[in-house]
UniProtKB/Swiss-Prot annotation:
One example GO MF annotation: glucosaminyl-phosphatidylinositol O-acyltransferase activity
Species of provenance: Dictyostelium discoideum
Protein name per UniProt: Phosphatidylinositol-glycan biosynthesis class W protein
Name of the gene: pigw
Spans traversing the lipid bilayer: 26-46, 59-79, 82-102, 127-147, 156-176, 264-284, 290-310, 331-351, 364-384, 399-419, 437-457, 464-484
Cellular component, GO annotation: endoplasmic reticulum membrane
Length: 492
C-alpha cells in the first residue's frame, strides 16, 4: 500500500464523533425485526410439510430477508425507519391473504417452553450470530464512502454502531461462557448421576453403594483437576486468538497496511483484547453474582482513576515512548471490556435459568426491557455528571451503553420467539455460530485483500454495494456449507 493512499485512508476513518444512542439502537433493532419478518413470510407462503423448503433455497431467502436489509440500513440510513415499519406492517397484513389460516402466536407452547429452557437457545444463537455478521459487514463497509462516517468507530468520545459492535462481541462471548451455563450444567450432571444411581440400585443395592462412593470420589478428583488445570485450559482455548493477534500485528507492520493507532495502540488489536479477557477469567473463578458485583466495582474504580488520577490524560496525551504507552489504549480499555464480560456472565446465567411457564419467560423479557431502560437512564446521568462515552477508553458510559442496547435486543429476541412459537435459529445464524472465530478471521482477511486490490475510499456507490453484498454473501455461504457438511474449523 503506497504511503499517500495509506495516509488518505487513515484520515478517512479518523476524527469521527459518532452518531446518537437512538440511531445506533434503531439500526441494531432491524436484525430481530427482520427475523420476525422472515418467520411470518415463511409461515405464510412456505408452510407445507409435504413439500418442505429446500435448505439451499431457505439460505438464499434468509440472506435476502435478514442480511440484505441490514446492509441497506448501514449504507442508506434514511431507509431504516421505512424498513422497520414496512416489515412490521407486512407481518400484520400478509397472513390475512394466506390460503389457509396461519397460526403465529403460541404455535406450540409446550415445545416452545421446552426449547427456551434447553442448553441450545435459538434466540441466543441468533443474537450471537447476527452480532458477528454485523461486525464482519461493518469492518469492510467502513472503508467505503457509502458507509456513513458517523457509524464508524469514534476517535475519542461519542457512540456509534461500530463502537457498540465491539462491546457486543465481548458480551456475546460472556453469555455462553461456562460460568454462565454452570448452574444448568450442574443440574444436568446431577440428574444424570441420579439416573445412573437409580439404575444401579435396581440391579443391586450393594453395587449401588459401591458405585455411589466411586462416583463421589471420581467427582471430587475431577473437581480438584479442573481447579488446578483451569488456567492451562483457558490459555489453550484462547491460543488461536492470541496467535491471530500476533499474526495481524506482524502483517500490518510488514506490508505497510493502514492502521488507526488511537484505536488500540501501536501493537495491540481486538484479538488480544478478546484473548486476555477470557484468560483473566481463570483467575476470577467466582459464581455469577460475585462476578457481576466485581464487574461493577471494577468499572467504577476504573472510572474513578480516569477522572481523579490523570488516567484520561495519560491515555489521550502521553507520548508513546515505551511498550506500555505505545499500547495504552488497548491495555487500559481492557479493564472496561473485562467489566462487560464479568457482568455478562450474570446476564448469561439469567438467560440459561429454567423457567416453568411461558408467562415466566414473558416476565423475564419485560424485566430485560426495564433493565435496558434503567441502564439508559444511568447512561444519561453518566454523560451529564461523570464523563462522556468513550470506546477508546471503554469507560463507564461505554459499558452502560453496551448493556442498555444489548438488553433491549435480548428482550426483543425472546418476545419474537414467544410470538412466533419458532424456537429454532435461522439457517444462517446456526451456520455462523458453528464457526464464529473462523468466519471472523476470514472476514478480516477478505477485508485486507479487498483493501489491497482497490482504493476503497474512492469507489462509487454501485461498486461499493456490489462488493459489500458479495463479500457478505461469500462469508454466509461458506458458513452454510461448513455447517451443512458438519465441519468445525479449529486451529488447536
Amino acid at each position: 500500500m503506497d504511503d499517500q493512499y495509506k495516509n488518505d485512508h487513515q484520515n478517512f476513518v479518523s476524527g469521527n464523533d459518532g452518531s446518537t444512542f437512538f440511531e445506533t439502537c434503531f439500526i441494531l433493532t432491524l436484525m430481530p425485526i427482520s427475523v420476525l419478518f422472515q418467520r411470518v413470510v415463511f409461515a405464510t407462503f412456505f408452510n407445507n410439510d409435504k413439500f418442505p423448503l429446500p435448505l439451499a433455497l431457505r439460505f438464499i431467502l434468509e440472506f435476502f430477508f435478514i442480511i440484505v436489509p441490514f446492509i441497506s440500513a448501514i449504507t442508506f440510513t434514511e431507509l431504516t425507519p421505512f424498513l422497520i415499519v414496512g416489515m412490521l406492517i407486512t407481518c400484520l397484513v400478509v397472513p390475512m391473504f394466506a390460503q389457509k389460516n396461519v397460526t403465529i402466536y403460541f404455535k406450540n407452547p409446550k415445545e416452545t417452553l421446552l426449547n427456551l429452557n434447553s442448553m441450545r437457545k435459538g434466540f441466543l444463537e441468533e443474537y450471537r450470530a447476527f452480532v458477528m455478521a454485523a461486525t464482519c459487514i461493518c469492518i469492510l463497509a467502513v472503508d467505503f464512502q457509502v458507509f456513513p462516517r458517523r457509524l464508524g468507530k469514534t476517535e475519542t468520545y461519542g457512540i456509534s454502531l461500530m463502537d457498540i459492535g465491539v462491546g457486543s462481541v465481548v458480551l456475546s462471548g460472556a453469555l455462553v461462557s461456562r460460568q454462565s451455563r454452570s448452574s444448568l450444567i450442574e443440574k444436568q450432571q446431577k440428574k444424570k448421576r441420579e439416573e445412573e444411581e437409580d439404575d444401579n440400585d435396581k440391579i443391586n443395592k450393594t453395587s449401588s453403594s459401591s458405585s455411589s462412593s466411586s462416583s463421589a470420589l471420581k467427582q471430587q478428583q475431577q473437581q480438584v483437576l479442573s481447579r488446578s488445570s483451569l488456567m492451562w485450559h483457558q490459555v489453550k482455548a484462547q491460543a488461536p486468538l492470541m496467535i491471530l493477534g500476533f499474526v495481524r500485528m506482524i502483517l500490518t507492520k510488514s506490508i505497510n497496511y493502514q492502521e488507526h493507532v488511537s484505536e488500540y495502540g501501536l501493537h495491540w488489536n481486538f484479538f488480544f483484547t478478546l484473548g486476555f479477557v477470557s484468560i483473566s477469567l481463570a483467575f476470577l473463578k467466582f459464581n455469577a453474582n460475585i462476578s457481576a458485583i466485581l464487574g461493577v466495582v471494577l468499572i467504577c474504580v476504573y472510572q474513578f482513576l480516569l477522572n481523579s488520577f490523570g488516567l484520561t490524560d495519560y491515555i489521550l496525551n502521553h507520548p508513546r515512548d515505551n511498550l506500555i504507552s505505545m499500547n495504552k489504549e488497548g491495555i487500559c480499555s481492557f479493564v472496561g471490556y473485562l467489566a462487560i464480560y464479568l457482568i455478562g456472565t450474570k446476564i448469561g446465567t439469567e438467560l440459561f435459568k429454567v423457567r416453568s411457564s411461558l408467562t415466566e419467560w414473558r416476565k423475564f423479557a419485560t424485566k430485560l426491557l426495564i433493565s435496558s431502560i434503567v441502564f439508559y437512564i444511568l447512561w444519561i446521568l453518566c454523560e451529564i455528571y461523570i464523563d462522556k462515552t468513550s470506546r477508546r477508553m471503554a469507560n463507564l458510559g461505554y459499558v452502560l451503553a453496551i448493556l442498555s442496547i444489548n438488553l433491549f435486543n435480548f428482550s426483543i429476541n425472546i418476545l419474537i420467539t414467544l410470538i412466533t412459537g419458532n424456537h429454532n435459529a435461522s439457517v444462517i445464524a446456526k451456520s455462523i455460530n458453528r464457526n464464529q472465530l473462523f468466519i471472523f478471521l476470514l472476514g478480516n482477511i477478505l477485508t485486507g485483500l479487498i483493501n489491497f486490490s482497490m482504493k476503497t475510499i474512492y469507489a462509487p456507490v454501485e461498486q461499493s454495494m456490489i462488493i459489500i453484498t458479495s463479500y457478505t454473501f461469500a462469508l454466509c455461504l461458506l458458513a452454510f456449507i461448513l455447517d451443512y457438511k458438519n465441519i468445525n474449523i479449529k486451529f488447536w
